[in-house]
């Protein structure tokens, strides 16, 4: 049977002094701290709710945890282990699922690879780029090619 991954919220709760201490799902000891975490319908010490891979404290990293294959994971490790990867359209190397990317039509690029494929000029926010035969071109190289060949591309 195929189990789907799930993400769950993490709540930080203040412990009221007059309430009976709750048991921690991580260490099975009573939680006597000022704050506790609630996740997966269980209560946790702040130090006990950790990513199974990197040991980061999930209450500090964000408000979401991920579970799959009986593991409790932070977002980065969840994506690293179970996320979909692809290849960069410029360098053909693998792009990890957790890495930031740039997209142009159906092409996906590493941030460092998102540059004119003729002159290697990196693009800044707001710069125009053109697609010609799945190549990214800066405006200068596109216009030079247009003058030489009379081709057209799609402006992005």
Curated annotation (Swiss-Prot):
Annotated Gene3D superfamilies: Cysteine Rich Protein
The cross-references to Pfam families, in alphabetical order and at most eight, read: LIM
Q: What residue stretches are annotated with the LIM zinc-binding domain?
A: 22-84, 86-148
Signal peptide range:
none
Print the keywords alphabetically: LIM domain, Metal-binding, Repeat, Zinc
GO biological process terms on file: positive regulation of transcription by RNA polymerase II
Name the GO cellular-component terms.
nucleus
One Gene Ontology term of the molecular function aspect: transcription coactivator activity
Is this entry keyworded GTP-binding?
Answer: no
Is Repeat among the key words of this record? yes
SMART domains (alphabetical): LIM
Q: Which PANTHER family match?
A: LD11652P, LIM DOMAIN ONLY PROTEIN 3
Instruction: Give the protein name, as stated in the record.
Output: LIM domain only protein 3
Q: Which organism is it from?
A: Xenopus laevis (African clawed frog)
């Amino acid at each position: 049977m195929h189990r789907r991954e799930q993400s769950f919220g993490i709540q930080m709760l203040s412990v009221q002094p007059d309430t009976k201490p709750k048991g921690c799902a991580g260490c099975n000891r009573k939680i006597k701290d000022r704050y506790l975490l609630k996740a997966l319908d269980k209560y946790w010490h702040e130090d006990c709710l950790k990513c199974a891979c990197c040991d980061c404290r999930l209450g500090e990293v964000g408000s979401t945890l991920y579970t799959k294959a009986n593991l409790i994971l932070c977002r980065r490790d969840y994506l690293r282990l179970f996320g979909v990867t692809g290849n960069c359209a410029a360098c053909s190397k693998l792009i990890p699922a957790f890495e930031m990317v740039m997209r142009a039509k159906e092409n996906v690029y590493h941030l460092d690879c998102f540059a004119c494929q003729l002159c290697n000029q990196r693009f800044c926010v707001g710069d125009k780029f053109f697609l010609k035969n799945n190549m990214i071109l800066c405006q200068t190289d596109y216009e030079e090619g247009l003058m030489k060949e009379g081709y057209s591309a799609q402006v992005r």
